[in-house]
Amino acid sequence: MSKDRRAPHVSSDHPVSGVAGRYATALFELADAEGALDAVAGDLERISAMLNESSDLVRLVRSPIFSAEDQTKAFGAVLEKAGISGLVKNFIGLVIRNRRLFGLSDMIGAYTTLLARKRGEMTADVVSAHPLQAAQVESLKAALKSATGRDVRINTKVDASLLGGLIVTVGSRMVDSSLRTKLNSLKIAMKEAS
């Protein structure tokens, strides 16, 4: 593959680079050539959701203790149960054979970024203390669209350590309105005052 074919052919908000970026770009270009961008995105979203829900699956992905054979068997069963086949199944197999499964979450994120660029969307990562309701996500999308002038795709994640509030990252900008940050700021201010 020539060097200029490796670079994504769409404009960027986030650089997609490194090992995860190369794998995601290869999958993206293959999916684009086969007209399967949305199908692959759906499969990757399901895998991402499974990773968010299962600490055992995360351990399988991140731990170097598991052999490629163990990862292939276990992940193969997970993919089959989730009804994921085709490009994504082959992609995961390649990632496992190359011992890069630890970077799967980054690869999924990079693919999502590439797809959003192609669609002219921005991606916002939103971390909240509690799961957001659908109405809250839609309200946040509308507010971000108003602020950026572009359609915004929202990736949500729950982190109970925030206590309350949100951390929103769009491009290189981050807004941290979490209760944890406010309490830490108050604690620092109190230490400086004494």
UniProtKB/Swiss-Prot annotation:
Disulfide bonds: none annotated. Coiled coil: none annotated. One of its GO terms (molecular function) is proton-transporting ATP synthase activity, rotational mechanism. Keywords: ATP synthesis, Cell inner membrane, Cell membrane, CF(1), Hydrogen ion transport, Ion transport, Membrane, Transport. It is found in: Cell inner membrane. Pfam families: OSCP. One of its GO terms (cellular component) is plasma membrane. Its main location: membrane. It is a peripheral membrane protein. Gene3D superfamilies: N-terminal domain of the delta subunit of the F1F0-ATP synthase. HAMAP family: ATP_synth_delta_bact. Belongs to the ATPase delta chain family. F(1)F(0) ATP synthase produces ATP from ADP in the presence of a proton or sodium gradient. F-type ATPases consist of two structural domains, F(1) containing the extramembraneous catalytic core and F(0) containing the membrane proton channel, linked together by a central stalk and a peripheral stalk. During catalysis, ATP synthesis in the catalytic domain of F(1) is coupled via a rotary mechanism of the central stalk subunits to proton translocation. This protein is part of the stalk that links CF(0) to CF(1). It either transmits conformational changes from CF(0) to CF(1) or is implicated in proton conduction. F-type ATPases have 2 components, F(1) - the catalytic core - and F(0) - the membrane proton channel. F(1) has five subunits: alpha(3), beta(3), gamma(1), delta(1), epsilon(1). F(0) has three main subunits: a(1), b(2) and c(10-14). The alpha and beta chains form an alternating ring which encloses part of the gamma chain. F(1) is attached to F(0) by a central stalk formed by the gamma and epsilon chains, while a peripheral stalk is formed by the delta and b chains. This is ATP synthase subunit delta.
